[in-house]
């Protein structure tokens, strides 16, 4: 069968049988794909350490008859992001970003925007300790790529301007709520004016804006809670990596 080359980030690697491994990649060419790496555990000569999560690699794959899994024939590391692997906070944030990317997209649907965003965020983690603003920017960018962006520039229910004061946020309604709509929605979350402004800057400027956005408490907590609720609403659950971030503490980037 014809072989093709893909460039992708390892989102997950799962041991299979005694010697094999199944890897899930977010690729530039085909979106999310899974590939069967025969003998990956038995010998490191063929794949080396290239199949570790968060590795950016170039892979040669082929279709496998009767299987949704591609066959992984050879790989080479494009970028290993070695610096982030020595720090628990960076690993936790990278794991969360990888799991979020995996859950937001379907198989074999190209997502150039999300691929570029994930590579950029892993690069940021490789270069410096995790910043809460960068993780919020990644979440917002991933939601945009998936077509699920929360409404922050106006009321998600009626479309009216939300003004410059504090607002409420509701995941089910789709974002921020004005003073007229919020009382009719139970269990909304607070967003101070400064928190909303910071989220709007991150929504507009992405990871580049995160470099100059402190997002300190309590704004950091409000932003985290709002986006976590929004993601849980659309995914139907809290991601395992999100729970781990909660356990090790928001100061590590969560």
From Swiss-Prot:
The keyword DNA repair applies. One of its GO terms (cellular component) is bacterial nucleoid. It comes from the Bacteria. It holds the Pfam family RecO_N. Keywords: DNA damage, DNA recombination, DNA repair. One of its GO terms (biological process) is double-strand break repair. The keyword rRNA-binding does not apply. HAMAP family: RecO (MF_00201). Belongs to the RecO family. NCBIfam families: reco. Involved in DNA repair and RecF pathway recombination. This is DNA repair protein RecO.
